[in-house]
């Protein structure tokens, strides 16, 4: 994994995300910063991560989300071998329930 992906622009975006306080604020920011296609892609990746984390078979995830198995496999790879962001958020959401 390339270590040079994080720069001051990425950090600035992360800081912007950290000031959002509500779901509506987050939705408004995401809609302003992303095209509808980008937003749909992000939301599908997130749903794929949730389903894979829950143990749903990849083919079923792909079918349910109308995504390719390649996309689901890529999400699963990042879930298991990425920076830990998916897992961190999933665990925090589980702890809130």
Regions found by a protein language model. Give the residues of each.
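General nucleic-acid-binding
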Residues: 1-20
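Short acidic alpha-helix initiation/capping motifs at coil-to-helix transition points
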Residues: 4-9, 40, 52-53
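A general alpha-helix detector
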Residues: 9-13, 29, 47, 71
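C-terminal structural segments of small proteins and small subunits
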Residues: 14, 66-93
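Amphipathic alpha-helical interaction elements
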Residues: 18, 22, 50-53, 77-81
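Short, Lys/Arg-enriched anionic-surface-contact patches
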Residues: 25-44, 97
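Short, amphipathic alpha-helical "recognition" segments used to contact nucleic acids or chromatin
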Residues: 42-56
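Short alpha-helical "recognition helix" segments of helix-turn-helix
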Residues: 60-65
